[in-house]
């Protein structure tokens, strides 16, 4: 068998055994989806996969269950089979490829004071290396096992912080005996536009502090009625919120809420990785913290001396890249559990986009584009003064390998990579005012892009460069826009708090959310706390998050029940 055939067998094994996260990363790394599947008709791939499954059952059993080392001498002499391991010490925590595994067992208090036991396998050595690091790039050690955060013990209200010991190496969590907090103050807001609109289409979820950013956790197949998103707020507060939409019933609850040790620091970025196993937060001080899906801190980086302005995972979840206002780029390698910094010797890094699994492009206030590889600290290629002014946004279309850049010099440019790897400009879109928002419609078919200049949103064909539609509904400059993943909707928000949801098929207004302060906005044209800072679609396009600098986050619900 050649390499491709071996890869195909491994891919089939991962797929049929339900290892969805590993299968996703393996597909992206090997390009297995582009290989010839006809080979499977001439070889008994199913039989080979069955052999792999049987052979690895014992390996998985050894990984998922832990010997009770405190058992008496007679018990230790007795051979322990798989069934007894399952009954005595089942592991309660999930496995990931990128972090050392810690087994949670049902040990008695005499065996363990906190109910957690370090798994005695090859991961022990990796964990010891992480905890013993004392040189190199500064980072916080892995959190002690006793700091594991259980979802049921944490309340979003953060009411009692007096009895919590503040440790600068880890976040502060408030422990409560009460169950998960149910958010009961959900209210409805007024809206206009569209036909057959339900009165509960927009939901307002209150928060403890003003919201600065949010991101959806990738949808888990085992519970497709529950959607989880994480939000970052002022005062260094992080929270995870779950919403349940089943049988027209909308419920929201707080899974956990954390108070970081960096008080009075706004959270500037939040990003889930593609498999939903790790969550990264960035602070105005430049600190970056990584958490697992249960809310436990894994690592903390202190390389940046300025606010982190861009925070993005690579497509395979292998790397995390962060761009800072001090011109520093921080890279974290999940597989090696290492991180390092790149000093761009330039001004602020405003945005970062991954263009392959190990390459990314950056933009800065000088209007330059730089391409980096993860294994080097010098740029692979540079386009100096790609724009006459700062490049405020980057969007890369991986399917057609085109880069879109937006600048405050009132232009948007379309780029492709030449034979030497450097970006070359294909076309310039000129506007009458600075451009702050751009996005790609990533549906299959003709590539479409959207540009917002002042209060006008334009949609173009990226191949013919023809203008397809112009949306003129906003009365204030557009501050955020986003296409849904299925390409059916375009959401736009402005500095006055107005939000419009457009049909991409008909180029007509689908739904609209008005501002609560329309009279005041008509005079001032802007209210900082009303400005729409971000729009985030859920992975199945059923819900849309609307974020402002207010103590609330708005959720637009049930898009799947509306037909265009």
UniProtKB/Swiss-Prot annotation:
Keyword Magnesium found: no
Stored Pfam families:
LisH, WD40
Query: One biological-process term from Gene Ontology?
Result: negative regulation of gene expression, epigenetic
The residue intervals holding the WD repeats read: 262-302, 303-342, 344-382, 386-425, 430-470, 473-512
The coiled-coil segments of this chain are none
Q: Does the keyword Nucleus apply?
A: yes
GO CC terms in record: cytosol; nucleus; Rpd3L-Expanded complex; Set3 complex
Q: Which domain of life is it from?
A: Eukaryota
Task: Spell out which residues are annotated as carrying Phosphoserine.
Answer: 137
Compartments, record wording = Cytoplasm; Nucleus
Q: What is its main location?
A: cytoplasm
**GO MF entries:** transcription corepressor activity
Which part of the chain is the LisH domain? 2-34
Q: What does this protein do?
A: Component of the set3 histone deacetylase complex which is involved in chromatin remodeling and transcription regulation, such as repression of the sporulation gene program.
Quaternary structure note: Component of the set3 histone deacetylase complex.
Q: What protein is this chain from?
A: Set3 complex subunit hif2
Q: Which organism encodes this protein?
A: Schizosaccharomyces pombe (strain 972 / ATCC 24843) (Fission yeast)
């Amino acid at each position: 068998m050649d390499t491709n055939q071996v890869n195909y067998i491994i891919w089939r094994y991962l797929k049929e055994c339900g290892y969805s996260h590993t299968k996703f990363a393996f597909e992206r790394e090997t390009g297995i989806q582009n290989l010839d599947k006809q080979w499977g008709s001439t070889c008994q791939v199913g039989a080979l996969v069955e052999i792999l499954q049987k052979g690895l059952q014992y390996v998985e059993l050894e990984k998922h269950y832990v010997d009770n080392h405190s058992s008496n001498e007679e018990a230790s002499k007795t051979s322990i089979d798989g069934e007894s391991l399952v009954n005595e010490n089942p592991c309660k925590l999930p496995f990931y490829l990128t972090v050392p595994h810690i087994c949670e067992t049902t040990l008695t208090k005499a065996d363990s004071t906190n109910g957690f036991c370090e798994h005695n396998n090859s991961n022990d050595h990796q964990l010891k290396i992480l905890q013993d690091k004392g040189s190199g790039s500064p980072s916080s050690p892995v959190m002690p096992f006793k700091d594991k955060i259980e979802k049921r013990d944490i309340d979003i209200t953060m009411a009692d912080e007096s009895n919590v010991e503040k440790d600068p190496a880890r976040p502060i969590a408030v422990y409560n005996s009460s169950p998960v907090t149910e958010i009961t103050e959900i209210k409805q807001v007024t809206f206009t536009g569209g036909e057959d609109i339900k009165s509960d289409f927009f939901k307002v979820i209150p928060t403890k502090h003003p919201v600065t950013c949010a991101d959806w956790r990738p949808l888990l197949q085992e519970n497709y009625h529950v959607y989880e998103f994480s939000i970052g707020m002022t005062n260094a507060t992080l929270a995870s919120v779950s919403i349940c939409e089943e049988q027209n019933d909308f419920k929201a609850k707080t899974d956990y809420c954390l108070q970081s040790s960096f008080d009075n620091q706004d959270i500037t970025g939040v990003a889930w990785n593609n498999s939903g196993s790790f969550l990264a937060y960035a602070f105005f001080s430049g600190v970056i913290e990584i958490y697992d899906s249960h809310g436990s801190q894994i690592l903390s980086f202190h390389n940046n001396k300025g606010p982190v302005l861009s925070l993005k995972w690579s497509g395979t979840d292998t790397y995390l890249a962060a761009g800072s206002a001090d011109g520093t780029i921080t890279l974290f390698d999940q597989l090696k559990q290492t991180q390092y910094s790149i000093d761009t010797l330039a001004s602020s890094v405003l945005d970062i986009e991954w263009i392959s699994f190990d390459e990314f492009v950056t933009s800065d206030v000088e209007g330059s584009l730089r391409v980096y590889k993860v294994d080097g600290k010098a740029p692979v290629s540079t386009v100096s003064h790609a724009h006459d002014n700062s490049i405020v946004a980057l969007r890369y279309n991986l399917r057609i390998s085109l880069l879109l850049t937006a600048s405050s010099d009132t232009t948007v440019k379309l780029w492709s990579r030449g034979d030497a790897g450097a970006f070359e400009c294909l076309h310039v879109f000129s506007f009458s005012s600075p451009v702050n928002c751009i996005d790609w419609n990533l549906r299959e078919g003709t590539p479409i892009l959207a540009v917002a200049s002042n209060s006008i949103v334009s949609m173009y064909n990226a191949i013919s460069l023809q203008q397809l539609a112009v949306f003129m509904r906003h009365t204030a400059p557009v501050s955020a826009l986003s296409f849904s993943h299925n390409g059916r909707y375009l959401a736009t928000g402005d500095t006055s708090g107005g939000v419009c949801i457009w049909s991409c098929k008909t180029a007509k207004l689908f739904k609209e959310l008005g501002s609560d302060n329309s009279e005041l906005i008509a005079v001032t044209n802007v209210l900082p706390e009303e400005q729409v800072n971000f729009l985030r679609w859920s992975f199945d396009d059923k819900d849309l998050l609307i974020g402002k600098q207010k103590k609330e986050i708005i959720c637009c619900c049930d898009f799947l029940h509306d037909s265009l």
